[in-house]
Structure formats: structure tokens, C-alpha cells
């Protein structure tokens, strides 16, 4: 009898210890792919500090515009300021976004490929004309590069050998699988993500033609978890900022 009484007294405590606590609300984020390494690190740090999981979906800026216009809803958007301004005008995002950082463009080749001269704008022009294939994306950085080719007066010559992809990952895969004189252009952060697979960052575009794409994090107006979304945006612009800098997003 005494044993039964002891068990009865202990059992509620054991059940309380084994019962999991309340699940923390998860937030969803739609972001441009160029900030992926920094945002992944910040999301992990935020979850560790607060217990709130962060589920991130990466798309190009044109895809983000399309999804937001179609009514897709996330808790937070991370996109270039011009896109965020459009979303704000349409009432899709809240006020109080924070600057995440900016990403510059770089030149990428596969292992063993001849290293091109990228020392100045004229060298880039020669490199592009000499390449058998010129690879870049259809996102913000790719649109800039296309305009750069037009300003250089060589777009008509480059277009037949240009390979354009929706994502940076596809650009890197094309370069890695190449067998000739392929040269790729894309955000430096995306190039570095494929370093372990063999991509070689030749270097950034020269200063006179470099282009930086900035990114802003902002809560969506129709987000389901507004308080957590706002906390995450504050974290990204504060404690999480060094994680972006460490990933090459300055």
C-alpha cells in the first residue's frame, strides 16, 4: 500500500516533466537568394535565442514580385528596396523595414579553366567577347549585367552565346559542367556557396562597373505572426547583422 501511495504521489510530477511545453510559433520568410548564407545563419541564431522556427523560401526578385502580386502571404519579405517600395504602395508590407546589406557581382569559372583578366571594364569586355559561353541569371543582378553588355555595345555579339537561368544555383551548375571557355557572372555570395563543389571566384567586377544589390527585410501586412515577424526583422537589423557581414553581405 505504501508503495502504491509513493507511486501515486510521484506520477503527476513525472508526467509534468515528460509533457512537452507549448510549441513556439514559426514564421515564414520569402527572400532573394543572394543573401541566403547570411539569412540562414541569422534564422538559426534567432531560433536558438527565441525558440521560434524560421522557414525561409528563396526566389529571384522577379519571382518574389510575381508571388506577392498573386497574393502569396509570408510573415517577412527580404527583397531589394525598389521591390519593397512597390509592395508598400500596394499595402502588402508594413512600415519599419531594416537594411540587411548589399551584395556585389563577381566572375566565376570552373576548376582548371583559364583565368580571365577582369582588372578593368575593358578587360571584362574582352573576356566576355572571348568566352564561348557567358552565363548569368534572370534576377536583379542578371538584369544589370544585361544592361551593362548593352552599354558596352556588345550585347548583339554576346546574346547568341548567352545562357540565362532563373536561379544562381543553375548558373553555378552550368559553369561547373562546362568543358570550354565558359565564364559566369553572379552575386559573390552565390558563387562562394559553391566553392566546396569547385567553383572559382575570379574576383569582383571592377569598381567602375560594379553593381551592388541592397536588400531590405520587412514584415508583410497579412502575415499570420506579426509580433514574431517584427522581432525577427529587428534581430536581422541588430544582433544578426554580423552574421550577414561574415557571409560577405556588407
Give residue spans per PLM region.
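Exported/periplasmic ABC-transporter solute-binding proteins
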Residues: 18-62, 66-72, 81-90, 95-103, ...
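Bacterial N-terminal signal peptides
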Residues: 5-16
Amino acid at each position: 500500500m505504501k508503495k502504491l501511495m509513493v507511486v501515486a504521489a510521484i506520477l503527476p510530477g513525472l508526467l509534468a516533466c515528460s509533457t512537452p511545453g507549448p510549441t513556439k510559433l514559426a514564421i515564414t520568410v520569402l527572400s532573394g537568394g543572394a543573401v541566403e548564407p547570411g539569412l540562414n545563419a541569422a534564422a538559426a541564431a534567432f531560433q536558438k535565442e527565441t525558440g521560434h522556427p524560421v522557414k525561409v523560401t528563396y526566389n529571384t526578385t522577379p519571382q518574389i514580385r510575381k508571388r506577392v502580386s498573386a497574393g502569396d502571404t509570408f510573415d517577412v519579405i527580404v527583397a531589394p528596396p525598389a521591390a519593397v517600395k512597390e509592395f508598400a504602395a500596394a499595402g502588402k508590407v508594413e512600415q519599419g523595414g531594416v537594411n540587411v546589406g548589399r551584395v556585389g557581382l563577381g566572375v566565376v569559372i570552373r576548376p582548371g579553366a583559364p583565368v580571365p583578366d577582369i582588372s578593368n571594364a575593358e578587360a571584362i569586355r574582352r573576356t566576355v567577347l572571348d568566352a564561348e559561353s557567358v552565363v548569368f541569371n534572370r534576377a536583379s543582378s542578371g538584369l544589370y549585367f544585361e544592361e551593362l553588355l548593352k552599354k558596352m555595345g556588345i550585347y548583339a555579339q554576346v546574346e547568341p552565346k548567352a545562357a540565362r537561368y532563373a536561379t544562381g544555383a543553375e548558373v553555378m551548375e552550368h559553369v561547373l559542367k562546362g568543358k570550354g571557355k565558359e565564364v559566369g557572372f553572379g552575386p559573390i555570395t552565390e558563387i562562394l556557396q559553391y566553392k566546396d563543389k569547385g567553383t572559382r571566384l575570379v574576383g569582383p567586377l571592377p569598381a567602375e562597373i560594379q553593381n551592388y544589390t541592397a536588400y531590405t527585410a520587412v514584415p508583410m501586412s497579412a502575415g499570420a505572426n506579426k509580433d514574431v515577424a517584427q522581432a525577427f526583422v529587428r534581430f536581422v537589423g541588430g544582433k544578426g547583422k554580423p552574421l550577414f557581414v561574415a557571409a560577405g553581405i556588407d
